[in-house]
């Protein structure tokens, strides 16, 4: 994954005014100050900075970035397409209004492999517990992760049965899909759903929960809200399993080189996975427009605290969780669930040891 050093950030910051003034073109001459692997990301940085100012030169920079990115990164060409379709930086579709968009992403080969590794990690990390399982799924989406996790835990003897499942998601459509899926798989279990965001209801959740699961769901909150929310939830949980993207979209300022470089890598990789050889497939297109575009545009147009994505590196997660959950809840496991040249996902387990 591309990581900018302080000297790189300084060079990018020095070059941006030349881009904005029109003194610099994406022809490679001024970019000789950059390392070769940074050129595509810098052109994305320049193109999105121009797009944020409604500058007509943005597509040229983004197109030049796409030309050097190759098929594994699709951020530049997708943002250029957004500008062509919408005329400005705006998400083409509303997020999470159609479960099919999320389902397409979750069933990609890379995400299937990631989910399988997450389930394997959970089985390896969680201790055997007698009795029935009470579980809370935060941001459950369409329920696919939990639907794979629960039978694996029971089959491995981590719990004898599943007695109660609480599903939490802000999207009524996603929650409905998840509730139907889990209730069908576990007809003898009590399955309830709440249309809500965790940060709004953490202190009111009944609990207690033997297991709390958060799969790609807690990154929507900035660090201070994560800390406050998890502290409110801590008394109700015994074990916490998280799956998250290893990236820093929490601390960098809007329009900064670090944020642009990270978005170019991580969301560029996601878009390449979604669109791939199926770029004309309407389901793939809907997945990009509904699942990725709202997050991508938010990162490019909204400041910290207001944007929808606040991913954090795993080291910051460990520090935050230790602070929020208190001394009774300890780290019990960490594993890379998916490693690629452009984006990594990791799994975390914290719990109350016997």
Per-segment meaning from a language model:
Residues 1-73:
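N-terminal accessory segments
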Residues 200-206:
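Short conserved loop adjoining the S-adenosyl-L-methionine
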Residues 213:
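A conserved beta-strand element that flanks and buttresses the S-adenosyl-L-methionine
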Residues 216-220:
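Short catalytic micro-motifs in class I SAM-dependent methyltransferases
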Residues 245-322:
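C-terminal alpha-helical "lid/dimerization" subdomain adjacent to the S-adenosyl-L-methionine
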């Amino acid at each position: 994954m591309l990581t900018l050093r302080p000297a790189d950030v300084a060079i990018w910051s020095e070059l941006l005014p030349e881009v904005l003034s029109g003194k610099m073109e994406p022809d490679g001459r001024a970019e000789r100050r950059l390392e070769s692997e940074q050129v595509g990301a810098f052109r994305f940085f320049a193109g999105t900075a121009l797009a944020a100012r409604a500058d007509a030169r943005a597509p040229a920079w983004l197109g030049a970035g796409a030309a050097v990115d190759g098929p594994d990164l699709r951020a530049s060409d997708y943002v250029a397409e957004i500008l062509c379709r919408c005329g400005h930086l705006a998400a083409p579709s509303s997020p999470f209004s159609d479960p099919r968009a999320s389902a397409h992403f979750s069933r990609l080969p890379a995400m299937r492999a990631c989910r399988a590794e997450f389930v394997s990690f959970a089985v390896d990390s969680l201790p055997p517990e007698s009795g029935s399982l009470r579980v809370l799924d935060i941001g459950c989406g369409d329920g696919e992760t939990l639907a794979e996790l629960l039978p694996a835990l029971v089959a491995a003897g981590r719990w004898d049965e599943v007695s109660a499942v609480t599903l939490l998601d802000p999207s009524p459509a996603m929650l409905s899909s998840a509730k139907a899926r889990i209730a069908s798989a576990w007809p003898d279990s009590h399955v309830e759903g709440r249309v809500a965001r965790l940060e709004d209801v953490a202190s009111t959740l009944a609990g207690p929960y033997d297991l709390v699961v958060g799969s790609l769901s807690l990154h929507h909150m900035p660090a201070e809200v994560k800390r406050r929310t998890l502290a409110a939830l801590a008394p109700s949980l015994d074990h916490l399993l998280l799956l998250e993207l290893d990236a820093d979209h929490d601390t960098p300022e809007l329009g900064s080189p670090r944020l642009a470089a990270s978005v170019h890598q991580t969301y560029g990789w996601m878009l390449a996975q979604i669109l791939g050889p199926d770029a004309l497939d309407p389901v793939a297109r809907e997945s990009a427009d509904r699942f990725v575009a709202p997050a991508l545009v938010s990162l490019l147009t909204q400041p910290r605290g207001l944007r929808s994505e606040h991913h954090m590196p795993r080291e910051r997660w460990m520090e935050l969780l230790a602070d929020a959950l208190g001394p009774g809840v300890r780290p019990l496991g960490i594993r890379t669930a998916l490693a690629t040249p452009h984006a990594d996902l990791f799994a975390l387990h914290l719990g109350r040891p016997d």
